[in-house]
Amino acid sequence: MTIEVVQADHFRIPLPVVLSDSTHGEMSHFGLVTVRIHCANGQQGLGYTYCVGDIGGDAIRSLLERELAPLLIGSDASAVESLWERMWWHLHFVGRGGIAAFAMAAVDIALWDLRARVDGKPLWRFLGGEDPHVAAYAGGIDLQFTLAELEAQTRGFLDAGFRAIKMKVGRDDLGEDVERVKAMRGWLGPDIALMADANMRWSVDEAIDAARALRPYDLTWLEEPTIPDDVEGHARIAREGGIPIASGENLHTVYEFQRLITAGGVAFPEPDVANIGGITPWLAVARAAQAKNLPVTTHGVHDLQVHLLAATPNASYLEVHGFGLDRFMPEPLVIEEGMARAPNRVGHGVDLDWESLASHRAPRE
């Protein structure tokens, strides 16, 4: 399967409501960068990545077009792992994460999609999965929601079939966070899983104080309590805070995950396939977690990552993220009784409506 064309496209997708967290502030749109790989035999694979507020979207598209497309054209598309290594070392001096990992992710996802399509299997089954069902939670991006808005969102999530919900914390006043988490637990009762996400808002000491204050509300995990670079800080929060820690959406290499896992700084490693370099390194993170008897969860791009968790023996929850593409997909992800179901369509099964997306094409800068 010789690669003939690597087509990159960049879109700016408006959000139906303004979302908010403690780091990125208010978000009205996100960037979507897609890659379509066309082979000489007519086969095609699709990959994509995304960025908050479309920061970096044009740079990712440019990197794909100027560096990765010329590197890949003429190569055998079935050699997925070796092509990943080639991209990694080609971009190593300026990469090792950052926008390079986003660009590599879009390509790697497209190659795995192509590989599964050629084999005639859905991606989850191609990767060795037996059951397409994965426990899922609704990821609220709701830090500035009023309590009434938070309750309305929660009712909507429950009505949509979710049996686990994540909310944002990290307001200026810790007392407000406690009040909101207490209210959420009251609405949910004891049987619905509740997670809280601080988006790196706190120092280590502040995170420990927050974890201790939130401990009475039976959180499944506290996510990103501090900056991802502070590995020892994460370990200390895990030891002293009393709540399991989830982290990883801002870790863009396998090596960063290995350090955090080895240090005891995370109970739920949380790779995002769209920013860690794709499926190839995502699977390596899942194996590293399994070796330490840890479950792996996800961040973002749920339509892709449902396949990965369905094929992973140490799978935890799938995040169903607010940056969804449902309106551009004829068959969005199905949620029933708290479980997401990976589709049985060949490849990853994401079939985008390119005509609808066309009106959101980003201008070239």
Question: In which residue ranges do the predicted regions lie?
Answer:
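N-terminal basic, low-complexity leaders that serve as flexible interaction/assembly modules and, when applicable
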Residues: M1-P70, L357-E365
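Metal- or metallocofactor-binding catalytic centers and their adjacent structured scaffolds
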Residues: V5, H38-V118
